[in-house]
Curated annotation (Swiss-Prot):
Taxonomic superkingdom: Eukaryota
Annotated domain remarks: The N-terminal guanylate cyclase domains are required for enzyme activity. Fragments containing the first 470 amino acid residues are fully active.
Protein's recorded name: Adenylate cyclase type 10
Binding site for ATP: D47, I48, S49, G50, F51, T52, D99, K144, V406, N412, I413, A414, A415, R416
SMART domains referenced in this protein's UniProt entry, alphabetically: CYCc
Organism: Mus musculus (Mouse)
Keywords: ATP-binding, cAMP biosynthesis, Cell membrane, Cell projection, Cytoplasm, Cytoskeleton, Lyase, Magnesium, Membrane, Metal-binding, Mitochondrion, Nucleotide-binding, Nucleus, Repeat
């Protein structure tokens, strides 16, 4: 039975019949139009309140997950219940009108009495339904019902393509009046219905002053059997299902295929519905919350009661309305009788029908319809209401009876305006603003209180769309604000200034054309140009703005320009204009021809006989000749600059005149125009190709300029980074997009504004750690203050998810226009791509496209790339590069393009498309040009359809969701997949098997080698070797490894470089988002944690923080709290949070997180000395046991390994944190943490992990000062390495070891050995093709080379570092490069890259998220700049950069970069102290003591590393000499010299020697010593070529004040 029912439902005729009443389906109508049919029946009008409010609530919802589908479910939940009741009781649903419906019981007149009883019973049961249901979505849904009975007439009308029907007559008027009288839950009977019903069965309540009555309840006699009565009544209904069909709600569900009937019924159904039925798409596909324009037309007739009269009038009106709407892709949605009139509900912008300039077309259509219908003599009054906005467009009703309808406040507003403002075309403010028509086309109407509309806003009358010469009203539309800068358009203004200069110098015509899409800010550019042009003396700028209507008015542009030139724009009366004209043309034109100006300038010169005989063409020529003379006369007196906005609307005659004008006299014309929609006329083409024309295509604003714009628009000094990213990405650099996105955020109250606080006052927590805001450029600060000295900052409301926000209606409309202009296949491709995300690969798109082959897809993609829907990229590096820079403004050389032969153009286009196809084949990554398009297309899918496609995407991506092949496809969080069951439960077995083989669900053979070995270690270092011999042996070992890597690369060296960074963006992040969409929160959490871990590995703390935020939201949604996998995810989450906190220098938070993680991993870390002592004893015994163990146990299970690796990671961070603290007992905690890391790593039985632990343990003992212990563990590392096979991961272990040992040796001051090891590590990592590691080793190698003054080698390393930073687009390596360049300038006496270049890099990148949230590097850069300015004694600049550095000082991390940065910062503070002492500042001594304490603290810290001691002692010596403490100065200076000698630190030793010489000699330095030195610093190239002389090192960077040490005394400081 169900199969049969499904077969019936799939029939096209059944689907069509579901949109129509039985009255039409089974009707027999004559082919004449109009045709009339009369019958008797009962009408029920049901009005449902609450739907409009619900539609508004959904249409203004913030997030994309609250869309049309949810709304249609709620609407149909109620409406289908009503429809079902009506059908069960034998009714026929005639029409759905938004949130109301009209039902009919068609019977003979003698049956009316009984049928009314049935209908009343049905009405009461409908009310009962709603009383039982709870309010949905917080809205109270209630119904009002009106009933009428009597004589009904049906009118069928239309044209050859579409038919419509109406029911008219007294009963129809009565039923509407009855419903209007009803209150909530009332049933009202019309007077006639009350007359015809069985009064004995009905209890009523009288309505005062009305003949209609209200039904209270039915009161059947005790013996009354309603079922028998109902069955009897249904026998009189022609199409009530009975017998074999009694289980069907409607007989129309059983219709057999009948092509003739189907063709007939199709005429009653909208075209988009028929398309949906033909495409066999799911019901509901057309349900959307969609921006549309509603045109409500109401016709009132002179003889309302005569069907034949109104029938012909409606027919005439309908045919005309249909023809007008067809031109502009509008459609009639409903036609019904409405309060004594006939109403047409017309809609522009239905799915698939969206067109540009929709609002203008709607108004144009409305005016046309109004003009036509007003001429139909049988129509008394025509009233039209036009409203624009988001409404619900969708199929509403029951599966067996439904209609496509529109619901929303805008529908109501259009309907109310139509009734409250009769006899005119009225529109709302949104339509008025969106039309972009001149204000003089409209007149504001007085406000009226309209039923059901709380605040419609201003209402306007549309006066007509024929352009009139409104002198003084065609100025540029936008305003120029003195306090608002023109942002991001420097280049465009430069083009104007340059062209202007040429115009003035050559006295030759110039044309400057700015082409740009709507929203690019063309009008703003012209407004600025008008202002600049008017600043020059003897220059006259005439600026006008055209509209869409201007194009259709002959000679309109010249007419307006000449009116301005002649000064007519300021005249208040035609007589004044006439006098002005007479004075200007009397010498140029015979008086008898003055009347030539009558029409064009609205004057009244007497018409001469000669003029009346003149032909139209001759008049035009005379007029043009006169204008030429006037202009020739004017340009002799002053320079004329014509400025024309929206020049695409210049009419053809005006173009021809302009073309002639620029050839005849020197004139400067500036135009802005949107790209021509059609081929421009010959004259326009000629101007574009003229040698004196400069044609500029406007680019978008750059990210920094968008940031500036937002800060200026909001009047704030900073905005959140998340908001900045959202607006930069969402706007694509288009000013209008940015403004609309901001308005949308403001509308949803997402933005908060507060007084700016200093950063020192803010307590750092996890939630505010990354709330460092982005600021506008310095020159914008002036425009961002709310008042003098007061600044506000912008924040986001807590919990808001910007990326999930639904796009603003205005921007959605732009995307819908573009989508609807595409073919259906292209639309499908774009919608499928939208499911994948903003960025996607061709492989994944092909996977989810239904029934496409690769050739079809490539061809479609090429077209869409050409149409600027997608951008394509060969690699993720290209993508990242493109995202950093928006398309800039550029000049188009149409003259050279025009040289191509016309015959070749078509061929060229085809060739271009073929080239694009080839490019798409090569490019595997694509991205939506506009994120708004992706969001808009995504919202068009149904929930179930989305789920199917998200699942397809997830299954495809899972196979690659791990590290790249280069990194052996492992997890970013070691052994993560062993803990969390993320794949197997949802995938088929073939996929599972494939994934097992590709991803290593079991440990592969190579991993097994490193994880366990049954054989005892073969190699041991002989005990009698000296340190030198061991050193040579180690270096020789690494040399051998490098030799073997070079000699057999195929076995050892990976074929491709690391691709992990790319995989994060195109695989793992999209996969996490697909799982979020599928509500698979545990899987989504897994991948967000993987992402966070990966970004921490890549040094991107901000992204790690953001994805941990996503993870935290998902963790809160998980319910199975007792599962081990969830516990592990919590532990991972806390450990990753700890790592972020550690990197940001928030050690207290980091420690707290690590303790939480270890507790969840069942490794509680002691929190008091008693448990510490006990745990220390346990761990020492464990370590002894592991170290003395000769054979290893069986392999460790994957789950256990995951746990151990995470524990080891936590302990590694913990000992570093404890090492930072001075408290004596903290070193024991640090020692315990280091030992626990060691034991945990040994338990893994993995060589790589064990070697890492040995190296960590060695470093810990180095820094803690345990001289003998560290050596033992370094030997153990080498013994471990010597026992590994030379392949795969073992090579990486060896490279890692060389690199880490080199780093440790550098920290400890063994600079020669650090260089030896670093050089070998560099060669190994370069062969292993891992950019991240290669970058790190180059950075590390540069520092010992710098301190050893080995500049030739250093410059070579810097060259490699620069090449890497450019190739990989790596900001960290580029920043480090400039840091070393600054060091070279400050300390080495030559220039490798200029100071200006370094400073520019900092200015452009200081807000980069990797640098901003990386501890040390930005601190170092700021501090170096501050030191430079301090030496130049430019103290304002010094303070600026020193203050920036100061904010970063608090991020204390035990890293080399931090100590490099802090030592530069301290140097700046010491130089500032010198200034204070010279100026005898009051707090100088306090500052000196504070600086000395800070330096002593740095030296005392375990984590600092001896390599920094010489510099720190040097600074301490200088502070002492400044403060008059010669004894301490000697001590610190000598200590620093000894350490420099020991380390081989030639650079510091040289500086110390010079300081000693200067401080203890009688020599004096001049104040501008450093300035003189700066000016004579040689470049590296000059030094190499021998032209630069010696490097400048004959000066000291510390120039003590000009007074002897003995003169310093305590009172002076006070």
């Amino acid at each position: 039975m169900s199969a049969r029912r499904q077969e019936l439902q799939d029939r096209a005729i059944v689907k069509i019949a579901a949109h129509l009443p039985d009255l039409i389906v089974y009707g027999d109508f004559s082919p004449e139009r109009p045709s009339v049919k009369c019958f008797d029946g009962v009408l029920m009008f049901v009005d449902i309140s609450g739907f409009t409010a619900m539609t508004e609530k959904f249409s203004t919802a913030m997030y994309m997950d609250r869309g049309a589908e949810q709304l249609v479910e709620i609407l149909n939940y109620y409406i289908s219940a009503i429809v079902e009741k009506v059908l069960i009781f034998g009714g026929d649903i005639l029409k759905f009108a938004g949130d109301a419906l009209l039902a009919l019981w068609k019977v003979e007149r003698k049956q009316l009495k009984n049928i009314i009883t049935v209908v009343i019973k049905c009405s009461l049961e409908i009310h009962g339904l709603f009383e039982a249901k709870e309010a949905e979505e917080g809205l109270d849904i209630r119904v009002k019902i009106g009933l009428a009975a009597g004589h009904i007439t049906m009118l069928v009308f239309g044209d050859e393509t579409r038919n419509y029907f109406l029911v008219i007559g007294q009963a129809v008027d009565d039923v509407r009046l009855a419903q209007n009288m009803a209150q909530m839950n009332d049933v009202i009977l019309s007077p006639n219905c009350w007359q015809l019903c069985d009064r004995s069965m009905i209890e009523i309540e009288r309505i005062p002053d009305q003949r209609a009555v209200k039904v209270s309840f039915l009161k059947p006699p005790p013996t009354f059997n309603f079922d028998e009565f109902f069955t009897k009544c249904m026998g009189f209904m022609d199409y009530y299902p009975s017998g074999d069909h009694k289980n069907f709600l409607r007989l129309a569900c059983m219709l057999e295929s009948d092509p003739e009937l189907e063709l007939s019924l199709q005429k009653y159904v909208m075209e988009i519905i028929l398309k949906q039925i033909d495409d066999k798409q799911l019901r509901g596909y057309l349900s959307e919350l969609r921006p549309v324009t509603i045109v409500f037309v109401n016709l009132m007739f002179k003889e309302q009661d005569k069907v034949e009269v109104i029938g012909s009038a409606i027919q005439a009106a309908c045919v005309h309305i249909t023809s007008v709407l067809k031109v502009f892709r509008g459609q009639i949605n409903k036609v019904f009788m409405f309060d004594k009139g006939c109403s047409f509900l017309c809609v522009f912008g239905f799915p698939g029908e969206k067109a540009p300039d929709e609002i203008t077309h709607a108004l144009e259509s409305a005016v046309d319809i109004f003009d036509f219908c007003s001429q139909v003599h049988k129509i008394r009054t025509v009233s039209i209401g036009v409203a624009s906005g988001i409404v619900f467009c969708g199929i509403v009703g029951h599966t067996v009876r439904h209609e496509y309808t529109v619901i929303g406040q805008k529908v109501n507003i259009a309907a109310r305006m139509m009734m409250y403002y009769p006899g005119i075309v009225s529109c709302d403010s949104v339509t008025y603003d969106g039309s972009n028509l001149p204000a003089y086309f409209f007149k504001e109407l007085p406000k009226k209180v309209m039923k059901g509309v709380a605040d419609p806003g201003p209402v306007y009358q549309c006066l007509g769309l024929n352009e009139k010469v409104m002198f003084g009203m065609a100025y540029l539309i936008c305003n120029r604000y003195e306090g608002y800068p023109l942002l991001g358009r420097v280049r465009e203004i430069d083009y104007f200034m340059s062209t202007m200069k040429d115009f003035l110098m050559t006295n030759c015509s110039r044309v400057l054309m700015y082409e740009g899409l709507p929203g690019y800010g063309k009008s703003q550019v012209l407004m600025e140009i008008e202002y600049l042009a008017s600043q020059h003396e003897n220059h006259r700028a005439v600026a006008i703005a055209l509209t869409k209507i201007s194009f259709h008015q002959n000679f309109y542009t010249i007419q307006i320009l000449m009116a301005n030139v002649l000064g007519l724009d300021t005249c208040k009366h035609y007589k004044e204009r006439q006098t002005n004209l007479q004075n200007r043309v009397k010498t140029l034109l015979d008086e008898k021809f003055h009347c030539l100006l009558n029409d064009i300038f609205h004057v009244q010169f007497p018409v001469s006989r000669e003029m009346s005989r003149m032909s139209k063409i001759r008049k035009q020529k005379q007029l043009e000749a006169l204008f030429m003379k006037i202009l020739a006369q004017t340009v002799r007196e002053e320079r004329i600059i014509f400025i024309i906005d929206e020049a695409q609307f210049v009419d053809g005659t005006s173009w021809a005149f302009i073309e002639k004008l620029i050839r005849s006299m020197p004139i400067f014309i500036v135009m802005s125009l949107a790209p021509f929609s059609e081929v421009p006329c010959a004259a326009a083409n000629a101007i574009m190709k003229n040698r004196n024309t400069t044609y500029i295509t406007l680019g978008t604003m750059q990210p920094q300029e968008i940031r500036d714009k937002v800060c200026v628009d909001l009047s704030v000094s900073s905005i959140p980074r998340e908001l900045d990213s959202y607006l930069v990405e969402g706007s694509c650099g288009i000013p209008y997009y940015c403004e609309e996105l901001l308005k949308n955020l403001d509308h949803h109250r997402v933005l908060l504004f507060q007084q700016a606080e200093t950063e020192q006052k803010t307590n750092v927590t996890w939630n505010n750690m990354f709330k460092h805001s982005v600021r506008p450029t310095d020159d914008m600060q002036l425009f961002t203050s709310i008042s003098e000295g007061q600044k506000e900052v912008c924040y986001l409301v807590s919990g808001v998810r910007l990326n999930n926000l639904s796009p603003p209606a205005s921007l959605k409309e732009i995307s819908l226009v573009q989508l609807d202009s595409m073919s259906l296949s292209h639309q499908m491709l774009v919608r499928c791509a939208a499911i994948i995300g903003l960025t996607f690969t061709t492989e994944l798109l092909f996977e989810i496209l239904p029934c496409w082959n690769m050739k079809m897809m490539i061809k479609a993609l090429a077209t869409l790339v050409e149409s600027n829907v997608f951008n394509c990229f060969r690699s993720s590096k290209d993508l990242q590069l493109a995202l950093k820079q928006n398309v800039p403004t550029f000049e188009v050389h149409y003259r050279s393009l025009a040289l191509k032969l016309k015959e070749g153009l078509t061929y060229g286009e085809e060739e271009e498309l073929r080239e694009m196809e080839g490019e798409v084949v090569e490019c595997r990554i694509l991205r939506f040009c506009r994120p708004i398009m992706q969001k808009t297309a995504y919202e068009l899918w149904l929930k179930d359809q989305k789920k199917v496609l998200h699942l397809k995407c997830a299954r495809f991506l899972e196979e690659s969701a791990h590290r790249c092949n280069h990194c052996r496809n492992v997890d970013f969080i070691p052994y993560h997949h062993f803990i969390v069951d993320i794949r197997l439960n949802t995938l088929d077995m073939d996929t599972v098997k494939r994934m097992v083989t590709s991803q290593g669900f079991k440990i592969d053979e190579e991993e097994a080698i490193f994880s366990k070995s049954e054989l005892p270690r073969k190699y041991k270092f002989p005990e009698n070797l000296s340190i030198t011999e061991i050193r040579e042996k180690i270096l020789h070992f690494f040399d051998n490894v490098i030799l073997k890597m070079k000699s057999s690369p195929n076995d050892i060296i990976p074929l491709e470089s690391c691709q992990c960074k790319e995989l994060l963006q195109i695989v793992i992040l999209p996969l996490a988002q697909h799982f979020v969409a599928l509500e698979e929160n545990n899987k989504a959490l897994y991948y967000f944690l993987e992402l966070a871990s990966a970004y921490l590995i890549l040094g991107d703390n901000y992204n790690a923080y953001m994805y941990l935020g996503e993870g935290e939201r998902l963790l809160k949604s998980l319910t199975n709290e007792d599962s081990w996998s969830q516990t592990f995810e919590y532990a991972t989450f806390y450990s990753l949070k700890a790592e972020v906190c550690f990197n940001m220098g928030q050690m207290v938070l980091a420690k707290k997180m690590l303790r939480k993680a270890l507790k969840l991993l069942n490794r509680m870390f002691p929190c008091n000395l008693l448990t510490l002592t006990f745990q220390m004893h346990v761990e020492k015994n464990r370590l002894s046991h592991f170290m003395n163990q000769h054979t290893q146990e069986g392999s460790v299970p994957g789950k256990k390994l995951a746990q151990l690796y995470l524990q080891a990671s936590c302990f590694s961070l913990l000992w570093r944190i404890y090492s930072l603290n001075f408290f004596f007992h903290y070193k024991y905690y640090g020692h315990l943490a280091a030992m626990m890391e060691m034991n945990t790593s040994l338990e893994t039985q993995n060589d790589f992990q064990i070697i890492k632990a040995y190296l960590d343990f060695s470093l810990y003992h180095h820094l803690a000062g345990y001289q003998g212990v560290w050596f033992k563990y370094e030997i153990l590392v080498m013994e471990q390495l010597l026992n590994l096979p030379l392949k795969g991961e073992a090579i990486e272990i060896m490279a890692y070891t060389a690199d880490t040992l080199g780093h440790i040796k550098f920290l400890m001051g063994h600079l020669d050995l650090a260089i030896e090891l670093g050089s070998r590590a560099h060669r190994m990592w370069s062969l292993l093709r891992n950019p991240n590691k290669y970058q790190m080793v180059l950075c590390r190698l540069s520092k010992p080379l710098f301190l050893k003054s080995r500049y030739k080698h250093l410059v070579q390393v810097l060259g490699w570092l620069w090449d890497l930073s450019v190739t990989e687009e790596d900001i960290f390596s580029k920043a480090f490069f400039y840091f070393v360049c600054l060091d070279i300038m400050l300390y080495s006496g030559f220039i490798y890259r200029t100071f200006e270049e370094c400073l520019e890099f900092i200015h452009h990148n200081e807000d980069n998220r990797i640098l901003k949230f990386q501890s040390g590097l930005l601190l170092g850069l700021y501090s170096c700049i501050a030191v430079w300015y301090a030496r130049l004694q430019e103290w304002d600049n010094f303070n600026k950069f020193s203050d920036r550095a100061k904010h970063l000082v608090t991020r204390r991390t035990p890293t080399v970069l931090y100590y490099e940065g802090i030592s530069r910062y301290m140097e700046g503070q010491v130089l500032h102290l010198q200034k204070q002492i010279e100026e005898q500042a009051e707090n100088a001594q306090d500052s000196g003591v504070e600086i000395l304490k800070a330096l002593e603290t740095l030296v005392a810290q375990n984590t600092t590393g001896p390599v920094f001691y010489p510099r720190l002692y040097h600074l301490m010596a200088y502070v002492c000499i400044l403060m008059g403490d010669g004894h301490s100065c000697d001590f610190f200076l000598n200590t620093a010299l000894e350490l420099s000698e020991t380390h081989g630190n030639l650079l510091e030793k040289c500086w110390l020697s010079m300081s000693k010489e200067w401080w203890y000699s009688a020599s004096e330095l001049t104040g501008d010593q450093w300035l003189q030195t700066v000016l004579s610093l040689p470049s590296w190239d000059k030094i190499v070529s021998g032209k630069g002389g010696q490097r400048k090192r004959s000066w000291s960077w510390f120039c003590p004040p000009n007074f002897s040490m003995v003169s310093w005394s305590q009172p002076q400081c006070a």
